[in-house]
């Protein structure tokens, strides 16, 4: 499949749709044989062109792109025309994918068992009106703390109890991130109220009870996290 008649030099183009720019972007491809593309014929005034879509996941690293035949120079060209955007250190995302939280994807891609906790988890459960200035993310104590461009406050939680109340959020087709459920989050805000603040912890508990939360669920968790029990029990007695 070539552009123009048989007398012309054979040329190939990588053409992708950019949602950001609202138009097709065309990039010359010197040797398409070395790349893995899905090719679709498109009639134009110059003959038949080729639309090539690189077989890359929605979010990928440079190493993954390189493994599929894209050089650093070509990856930069894809960024220049708006087909790909850099969303973190060494992390890229195709612009023709659905919108996603780039910060959380970067954290999920680089950290071991990252889990939204404390204020970030309260916000997810609609137990606070405070907008978290950074992402509160728990990782197991002893795990490597990665360097990321996203604003994040890392919290080291004990490995033995790390999975208690841990659920997850799907971010895209490739990545998911952990999230502590509401009872675990409330207990954490009371045992770590020096980091969150007593007013935020008390309001979160008040809202949770208002929406049908059962105090017994929290008291069971205090057997695992005894540091939360005194302040939590006192606040429950005041509210109830």
PLM features per residue range, with description:
Residues 21-22:
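Short hydrophobic alpha-helical segments enriched in small aliphatic residues
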Residues 12-13, 17, 39:
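Tryptophan (W) side chains
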Residues 41-51:
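Short, composition-biased local secondary-structure segments
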């Amino acid at each position: 499949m070539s552009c123009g008649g048989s007398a012309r030099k054979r040329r190939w183009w990588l053409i992708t749709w950019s949602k950001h720019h609202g138009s097709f972007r065309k990039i010359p491809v010197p040797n398409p044989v070395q790349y893995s593309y899905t090719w679709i014929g498109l009639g134009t005034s110059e003959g038949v062109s080729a639309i090539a879509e690189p077989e890359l996941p929605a979010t990928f690293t440079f190493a993954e792109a390189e493994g599929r035949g894209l050089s650093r120079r070509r990856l930069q060209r894809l960024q220049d025309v708006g087909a790909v955007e850099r969303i973190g250190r060494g992390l890229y995302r195709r612009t023709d994918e659905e919108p996603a939280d780039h910060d959380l994807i970067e954290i999920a891609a680089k950290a071991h068992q990252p889990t939204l906790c404390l204020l970030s988890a309260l916000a997810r459960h609609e137990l606070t009106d405070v907008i978290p200035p950074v992402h509160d993310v728990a990782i197991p104590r002893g795990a490597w703390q990665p360097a990321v461009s996203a604003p994040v406050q890392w919290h080291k939680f004990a490995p033995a109890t790390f999975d208690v109340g841990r659920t997850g959020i799907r971010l895209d087709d490739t990545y998911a991130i952990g999230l502590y459920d509401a009872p675990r989050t409330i207990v954490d805000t009371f045992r770590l109220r020096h980091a969150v603040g007593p007013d935020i912890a008390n309001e979160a508990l008040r809202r949770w009870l208002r929406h049908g939360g059962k105090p017994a669920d929290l008291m069971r968790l205090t057997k695992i996290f005894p540091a939360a029990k005194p302040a939590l029990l006192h606040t429950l007695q005041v509210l109830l």
